[in-house]
Amino acid sequence: MSTEDNKRLVLEFLGHYSAARYDAALDLLAEDCTWWLPGHPEEFPAAGSVDKATVQRRLAGNLKLLPHGLEITTGAITAEQDRVALEAESRGTLVNGREYHNSYHFLFVIADGKIRRVKEYLDTLHAREALGAARASR
């Protein structure tokens, strides 16, 4: 795929994610996809690298915490060879009524027309506090 095709694939994935069309988003991930988040699991439980099945479970959990979805707005995007780097912001209303807003930098690796690897950088402290409070309110 060309770098433009890779960018389109990533933007399509994030469009599905933002619209809570998680099955369509998952279809764009390779079966052996890994998704990595920074941090230490004892401080940020989502930290580390997970497989596609775990990503699927986490997406299902998102709907419980963010019943109206998580709108993702994309910013700068750069592609080279099989990699796409992208800045983004998210906004959504948590189940406890609080607003959730975070900033991200993603690195996607594309292979055979699918997303093979994702590295997601975000404010893990904010995510832990906001999402933890939403879980506790359910």
Residues covered by each model-derived region:
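Amphipathic alpha-helical interaction segments
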Residues: Y22-A25, E43-F44, D112, E129-A130
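A solvent-exposed, acidic/Ser-Thr-rich amphipathic alpha-helical stretch
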Residues: E31-Q81
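Hydrophobic pocket/interface hotspot
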Residues: V10-F13, A25-L26, C33, V55, ...
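Short, low-complexity N-terminal intrinsically disordered segments enriched in polar/charged residues
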Residues: M1-E31, A133-R138
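A beta-strand edge to alpha-helix "cap/lid" segment located at domain peripheries
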Residues: S2-D5, A60-R138
